[in-house]
Amino acid sequence: MTISRTEQRVLHVLALGGRILHERGEGPKITTITCVTRDGLILADCDLAVFSRLRRRRLIESRAGGPYRLSPLGRAMVRPQSDNQGHITC
């Protein structure tokens, strides 16, 4: 499975303890998302299109309506980066 650079960046943030907060509109559809690092910074690269691709591939999951986190499949797909401390420049 090929993963784009943006998707890889989002998966790496989630692997380091980040989460994706979501809001729903009138119906069941998710209208806005915010990718937050474990330090509370917001990742600007994460938009609704990237979120939809990650969710469709089952790389992220939400449990009991909580924030989206990395699934076991997503954890296996994350490529290691030289930045192991989790310092992301936003």
Curated annotation (Swiss-Prot):
It holds the Pfam family YjhX_toxin. It comes from the Bacteria. InterPro entries: YjhX_toxin. Belongs to the UPF0386 family. This is UPF0386 protein Rru_A2144. It comes from Rhodospirillum rubrum (strain ATCC 11170 / ATH 1.1.1 / DSM 467 / LMG 4362 / NCIMB 8255 / S1). The lineage of its organism: Bacteria, Pseudomonadati, Pseudomonadota, Alphaproteobacteria, Rhodospirillales.
